[in-house]
Amino acid sequence: MVSNAVTRATKSELPIDPLRIVAKEMKHLTGNIRQLLGSGHPSLDRVAKYYTQAEGKHVRPLIVLLMSRATSLCPKAPDSPHTHSTATIDSAISPLDVLADVNPSSPDFSSQPESSEHDVLPSQRRLAEITELIHTASLLHDDVIDHSVSRRGSPSANHEFGNKMAVLAGDFLLGRASVALARLRNAEVVELLATVIANLVEGEFMQLKNTARDERNPKWSEDIFPYYLQKTYLKTASLISKSCRAAALLGRADATTVDNAYAYGKNLGLAFQLVDDMLDYTKSGKDLGKPAGADLQLGLATAPLLFAWKTTPELGILVGRKFEQEGDVQRARELVYQSDGIEQTRALAEDYSHQAIAALQTFPDSEAKDGLIEMAINTLKRQK
C-alpha cells in the first residue's frame, strides 16, 4: 500500500508542489501572524516580529493546512463540536475592556476574509498560524540556549537584541499563541497545543544530557537510542504530530482519521529530525544556512554518532565529556565518518517516512493527500 501511494505521488503528470495546493491559505500566513503579534511597546514589537521578516520554510503550517484539506474528505465524527467561523475565532471570550486594560494595543486578531474554499476552515487556518508562533518562540529560546549568532541567514535575535529581549519575545509569542488558541473554543485542541509547549521544555531538559544517567564515561547500552528518540519526539515531532491531530479534530473527522493524522505527524517529525541530524555531518555551514557541526560544538550526541558509538567504544569517552577537550569534535566526526552511522540514520529516517505515508492509506485520494505524501518524500531529500 505504501509503495502504491508513493508511486502514484511520484508518477503524476506534473510534479507535486505541496505549497501550491494550499497557496491561498499560505499567502496570508505571515501577515496574519504579524497582526497577532502587535504590541504597544516598540522594542517588543520589533523583537517579536523579527523572525517573521526573513521568509522561513513554514513547514509546520504547511503540513497543518494540507492535513486540514486532506481530512475534509474523511468520515466525520458523530456529534462533533461546532466548528467556529472567522468572526468567532477572532472574538474575545473575556470582556475587551479587561483584556486590553493598560494595554490599548492589544490586537483584535482579525484575519483575512474567509475564502470561498470550505475544505480548510477558519479555525484550521488559525491553527496553522498558532503552530508557527509556537515554533518561532522555540527558535527564540533555543538560540539563547545554544548561543547562536545566526538564523535564516541573518543575525539571530539574541545576537541582535540580547538574551533578555530574545527570551521575553519568545514568551510573548507563546502568550499570543495561547490567546489565539483559547479563541478556537475547542478544549481538546487547547490541551494538545498546551502539551506541546510543555514538551518543548521537557525535550530541552533531556537534551542537556546525552544519556539518561549522564555518566562521565558512559558505555553503549540499548536504552541510549530510546532516550534520544524520546527527546527528539518532545523537541520536534510533538508539535507536528499534535497539530496534525488538532487539524483533524477541528475538521470534525472521525476517531480513526484523527489517530492517523497524529501518526503521520509523529513519524514525519521523527524523520525530519533524523535528516536534520544527518545534515549536520554531511553539509557545509553555507549549505545549511547555519553553522555545520553545531551539534558536536554544543556537546550533543545525535543519531549518526549514537549509531557509530555502538561499534566504536572510543566515542563513549568523548560523549561523556561532551566533546569539550581540544580535538574532541574533529575526532568524533572522523569516527562517525569511518562508521556506517550516517547510513543507518538515513535508513531509520526512511523507515519513519514510510510509516508516515502508511498512516495516510485510509484517506480518500486527493491533491492534499498527495501533498502530504510528497512532504514525507521530500523530507528525505532535504539539503538544509
Stretches with model-predicted labels:
Residues 1-384:
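All-alpha prenyltransferase/terpene-synthase fold signal
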